[in-house]
A protein has these predicted regions:
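Active-site mouth loops of central-metabolism enzymes
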Residues: 28-43, 92-94, 181-185, 374-383
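Catalytic domains of carbohydrate-active enzymes, especially glycoside hydrolases
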Residues: 46-68, 79
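Substrate-binding cleft of extracellular glycoside hydrolase catalytic domains
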Residues: 71-170, 175-185, 270
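Hydrophobic faces of well-ordered beta-strands that scaffold small-molecule active sites
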Residues: 31-35, 58-62, 78-84, 118-122, ...
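Terminal membrane/secretory targeting segments in land-plant proteins
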Residues: 1-32, 357, 362-368
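Generic structural signal for hydrophobic
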Residues: 51-52, 72-73, 110, 199, ...
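Substrate-binding and catalytic surfaces of secreted/luminal carbohydrate-active proteins
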Residues: 49, 140, 144-148, 155-163, ...
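Short, acidic/polar
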Residues: 36-52, 96-110, 189-193, 385-389
Length: 432
């Protein structure tokens, strides 16, 4: 489990807000959110829950079952998807007792405390090609052990086990890039058929993460406007269906894949969907706002897709920027949040999809006094070790927002000092 932040952390709220004192929640939004906590200065969970309620968000998807975070959901009316992270999948697959212990500590205890747990996720995107098959032989056994543990604890009918999967597990051939040609990846097709039939037999949904931004990021020739929902693109036609955006086309490719796997009516949840605001030429406020405005309008209308009309269950990715995430997938990884690291909305947005109102920010965030790093004019050869100084600073701070245009030493050191809580010496040898 992730350790709790130190008491000196910048964004710890001074007083925990009792849930009984929270204002009544706003009208429920048509979407949930992913709440990640990989940040150097986490906002107090109780303050985040208050913000969720103020914005009408009644569902969250977590990436673990951290007690400090989950406890804040007790009595809040916010439904939760808890998760056993990828580093726990092997032990869950190997030992059924581990699954029972996991359920006892993370499900039974939290449900008894008033947390509305709806799903338990086993791993996260375990079949990504970048994992080189590390989870192929252990995910299904872990899934079955977790399901048995929930059944034994009496939760099997109300809490469903799922495996959130990336959209790279299915595709259409290059010579026929339409949804009806879609199927599961050849290397995992048999496994996926087994998994989806097992999930379906237990009345559990298929959870898929769909990212139009990544279609654009990985393919420079991808038509930009096909990433959005305003119809400003050439449509794709497929067996009488018309697709004007990649989200719908991707979703229906999954529908076809499930049909071919023998579960045509399987329920689908979109576990992650969103647009980053920094770290790439196409990751910016303008495009993020365009994406969300179109997507939320679509969700509010409950129109679904060509093959699955009606209401969809979706979780936006993500709630708050996480400055401790790995940037191996890209510099944008730390900038998916609807809110900045200190809980402020990045842009005007209405989760109801009606185009009215703005996001409510996190209340009660406290800040340390402002300090600044400046050059010491008496330092000799102050430019000699400039690259080393930048590397030093960026080893402590998130420098990805400036990655597209080059990084200024003072800015890097300033970020480093903030992350190190203004410790003496954090400005390094070129500062005073």
């Amino acid at each position: 489990m992730a350790p709790r932040p130190a008491a000196a952390a910048v964004f710890v709220v001074g007083a925990v807000v009792a849930l009984l004192l929270l204002p009544p929640p706003a009208a429920a939004a048509p979407v949930g959110v992913n709440w990640g906590t990989m940040m150097s200065h986490p906002i107090h969970p109780s303050a985040v829950v208050e913000m969720l309620r103020a914005n009408g968000v009644d569902r969250v998807k977590l990436f673990d079952a951290d007690p400090w975070t989950v406890a804040a959901l007790a009595g809040s009316g916010v439904q939760a998807m808890l998760a056993a992270p990828n580093d726990q999948v092997a032990s869950l697959a190997r030992d059924p007792h581990r699954a029972r212990d996991w359920v006892r500590h993370n499900v039974t205890a939290n449900v008894n405390a008033g947390v509305d747990v709806r799903y338990v996720a086993v791993g996260n995107e375990p079949f990504l090609k970048s994992y080189n098959g590390s989870f192929i032989n252990i995910t299904f056994p872990a899934l079955k052990n977790m399901q048995r543990a929930l059944d034994e604890a009496g939760f099997g009918q109300r809490i469903k086990v799922v495996v959130p999967l990336n959209a790279d597990i299915y595709s259409s051939p290059e010579n026929k890039p339409v949804p009806s040609a879609g199927s599961f990846r050849k290397d995992i097709n048999t496994l996926m058929v087994d998994i989806v039939n097992y999930l379906h037999a237990n009345d559990a949904p298929f959870v898929v993460n769909i990212y139009p931004f990544l279609s654009l990021y990985h393919n420079p020739s991808f038509p930009l406007n096909f990433s959005f929902f305003d119809g400003a693109t050439k449509p794709v036609y497929d067996q009488g269906m018309v697709y004007t955006n990649v989200f719908d086309a991707n979703f229906d490719t999954l529908v076809w894949s499930l049909r071919k796997a023998g579960v045509p009516d399987m329920r689908i949840i979109v576990g992650e969907v969103g647009w980053p605001t920094d770290g790439d030429k196409n990751a910016n406020i303008k495009y993020a706002q365009r994406f969300y405005n179109g997507f939320l309008r679509k969700m509010a209308k409950n129109i679904g897709t060509s093959l699955r009309p009606g209401r969809m269950e979706v979780y936006l990715f993500a709630l708050i920027d996480e400055n401790q995430k790995s940037v191996l997938p890209g510099r944008f990884e730390r900038h998916w949040g609807l809110f900045t690291y200190d809980g402020k909305p990045k842009f005007s947005m209405d989760l109801s999809g009606n185009g009215k109102g703005n996001l409510a920010e996190v209340k009660g965030v406290q800040y340390l006094p402002s300090h600044w790093c400046v050059f010491n004019k008496d330092t000799k050869d102050k430019y000699k070790d400039l690259p080393a100084s930048v590397n030093y600073a960026c080893s402590n701070a998130d420098c990805t927002p400036l990655g597209m245009s080059g990084l200024v030493l003072l800015e890097a050191l300033q970020r480093s000092q903030q992350q190190m809580l203004h410790k003496e010496g954090a400005c390094f040898q070129y500062m005073f």
